[in-house]
From Swiss-Prot:
Matching SMART domains: Mad3_BUB1_I, S_TKc
Stated name of the protein: Mitotic checkpoint serine/threonine-protein kinase BUB1
UniProt motif KEN box 2: location: 611-613
Summary of the tissues where the protein is detected: Highly expressed in testis. Weakly expressed in spleen and lung.
Swiss-Prot/TrEMBL domain comment: The KEN box is required for its ubiquitination and degradation. BUB1 N-terminal domain directs kinetochore localization and binding to BUB3.
Source taxonomy: Eukaryota, Metazoa, Chordata, Craniata, Vertebrata
Organism: Mus musculus (Mouse)
Region of interest (Necessary for interaction with KNL1), ranges: 99-132
Amino acid sequence: MDNLENVFRMFEAHMQSYTGNDPLGEWESFIKWVEENFPDNKEYLMTLLEHLMKEFLHKKNYHNDSRFINYCLKFAEYNSDRHQFFEFLYNQGIGTKSSYIYMSWAGHLEAQGELQHASAIFQTGIHNEAEPKELLQQQYRLFQARLTGIHLPAQATTSEPLHSAQILNQVMMTNSSPEKNSACVPKSQGSECSGVASSTCDEKSNMEQRVIMISKSECSVSSSVAPKPEAQQVMYCKEKLIRGDSEFSFEELRAQKYNQRKKHEQWVSEDRNYMKRKEANAFEEQLLKQKMDELHKKLHQVVELSHKDLPASENRPDVSLVCVGQNTCSQQELRGPSLSSISHQTSESSGEKPQEEPSVPLMVNAVNSTLLFPAANLPALPVPVSGQSLTDSRCVNQSVHEFMPQCGPETKEVCETNKVASINDFHTTPNTSLGMVQGTPCKVQPSPTVHTKEALGFIMDMFQAPTLPDISDDKDEWPSLDQNEDAFEAQFQKNAVSSGDWGVKKIMTLSSAFPIFEDGNKENYGLPQPKNKPLGARTFGERSLSKYSSRSNEMPHTDEFMDDSTVCGIRCNKTLAPSPKSIGDFTSAAQLSSTPFHKFPADLVQIPEDKENVVATQYTHMALDSCKENIVDLSKGRKLGPIQEKISASLPCPSQPATGGLFTQEAVFGLEAFKCTGIDHATVEDLSDANAGLQVECVQTLGNVNAPSFTVENPWDDELILKLLSGLSKPVTSYSNTFEWQSKLPAIKTKTEYQLGSLLVYVNHLLGEGAFAQVFEAIHGDVRNAKSEQKCILKVQRPANSWEFYIGMQLMERLKPEVHHMFIKFYSAHLFKNGSILVGELYSYGTLLNVINLYKNTSEKVMPQALVLTFAIRMLYMVEQVHSCEIIHGDIKPDNFILGHRFLEQADEDLATGLALIDLGQSIDMKLFPKGTVFTGKCETSGFQCPEMLSNKPWNYQIDYFGVAATIYCMLFGSYMKVKNEGGVWKPEGLFRRLPHLDMWEEFFHIMLNIPDCHNLPSLDFLRQNMKKLLEQQYSNKIKTLRNRLIVMLSEYKRSRK
């Protein structure tokens, strides 16, 4: 067998180098040689015939070749279902003019008992004038004679007793008209051709005539009666209709087959769904394991750093956080040397169920809270605060369920929260998180805040050392605490008598902080946006409140905010060690708390002189809370938990306006100082993304995890994309230029005005229509500013597609500002129930495909080499930038490169300015997958499938490499690229005979089409530099002239379209 395989490989090599015009003759010689030398090896002969069938199946010049038909008949002998094989040949047009195919096919059907179908096959061959005609007609006459011979014995037995099957036939004959009898159903009902009924009628008439002739030859059979029962010969399998004493009808038989087929389809569907679920579970487990390993590493690093820094903790001041606010009624200024607040999540509540949080996100919170807020030896920064009230808006919390009391029947709260940090240069640890509160300093420095049990397991010993708190005589109590709270706090008061100032001091409730005002993205995008979409609130360090017992002076609240609201402004700075199980645990852990209860003297408030270095080297964040009303009567005891949460809230309804106050001078100066710090923004971004939660549904990975290769079948699967969008740390709906509408998408028509919030849009005309969307040119203007008018595009899709908008926003966030113009810019997204409208930048001068077609009408027929090199250099740079953001475009082709007005206006050295990459609907964000993920699916655009897809190999970034190569090929030759595999090397099918710079282009296409694997991608910068060098050497004097000529062609093309 090995010898035969070697011989076959030699034969294949011979056929690849064969240049004759009759390859079938070579196959015929080889098969004859195999039959002579290996007559007993039938399996190999069958394999050889199968290869021959595949080789010549689509070569129409051999479809009626007698040699090829002979091999098809031989191959049919080895086929278990010959009828299906002959049907396949007939549908492919093979042997339609050969009598041997029809004779073999009809003979097989006759052997199976399907006489009616066999007769139809004979008649089909005669109708198609199959050669040789005489042989086919002779075989058909013999078939009819055999059919008559079968009928004659049955005629002599008509007077004998009938069996059950014959009774059934007799009933059918007497109760059915001749028209109904002609519609008898054969065995293979599903595959019967439409001409069978007519052929059946012809057959019966022929049989009737032959019976009359036999009666003249002294046959005793009556000519008037005998032919009729013979014409009713049953043409179906009686065994399937008769089962013992019962009989099936045709409908019941069909129903039985239908049920069997449905069961099979259901089984296949369930098996497919099971495999998808299995793959998804493995995918999630891989992500979870990967992130857990990374978090373990970070926790170990934190522990090592904490142990190293522990001896010097007494000489180190800390950075503390606060959510400061101002009451909208009083509007008084708050000042303090340190703004600190460490909030906790409610561990147990007597009146409502606590919201369970997964363990993994808590670990991420622990890492962030430890890494992002280290201590610093810097002076304190006072932050005076002022604010103004907000109007009718609501803060929706999407991560935890908390209670928000209302201040009136028509009052709603708005929480616009960022992060605030202030620096404390005192040796003692103050507590000013609750407003203008005086407290006694303590010499015990706060230990690192820990939020997970696993982290506590590592650094528990750090909190067990005894402390020596200072003694204070101030023992004011909080007047708003109820009896349960007083009893709880009394434990600390008792400790204060003997060991120092551990009592609860006088605490004032915080009013709402000043709000932040941002007037949209007009500066960034150049498009006026609806200003009724407030930013999503992000509250750092808030904790939920337990249900309070009703009091006579307590404000009523509705059930609407029982579970999904956020309490803003109320802070209680209790930091505990291990996670408490009961109130008693707080008592034992009170002296180990990192921030005990103090008052802080008002005379220690100082303004640092050097404001520029306030946060010079710190990983700090500034947070600003804005709430409309925050007057809450604390009527019942609160249970504290050590878990610190980050709550994000957003307002999806675009119909509610929001206003806000401005920063005070000190706060703005602090923010500017923060911008000047040397923070590694990439590190902070990764850590903030990790802090968003590592749910099972979320598949976002850390940037520096070296995970093994993971295979995903189809990155464009709708369910997978919905899963990725739902697991984002920053949802698409939280962007300030995203608007959700609770109505259906309106029908977009040209020459019509539409109102989108404060944006008035006039649809001018349809620019293009693809398989997934329609693109309109529109003129928009702000309702509040009649002079503002600008052209844009409206991309209308059904159903809603927020994925493209997400990719566009991620590109703008991850790319450098100087390259933003190279990619499509979306001004806003409007999401409806059944569709979406993306408002984006307009490019007026057509796509690269239009440019290629324009040159086809010139004498050159193709684009000049200088322009090809210019555009190719820009394309390689674009793709390089996209890949550096860990994004795959996925649909690079000539009609997705577009020219805008910048191409006509720019006259600098960058001659390709104005070329932009559009259509991000097929893009893939690799940051949402484990590092090293590969894909196996195929894109829908068959002409742009990369070699990895054609050879069923895994791929990721290769799809963009192939897209660039195919686009450049289209510019060079004016046609789409087709590739072929020659000896394992992929090449374009076109000839490169008179192409300038042949060596360079052959090397380029070889590199782009023959990528070793997903982990060894070629350098786009290397290819770009080679082209740039060639362009400067050969075409530096011609390129501007060619570019100006193209500008004229584009301008004329634009005018012709109008």
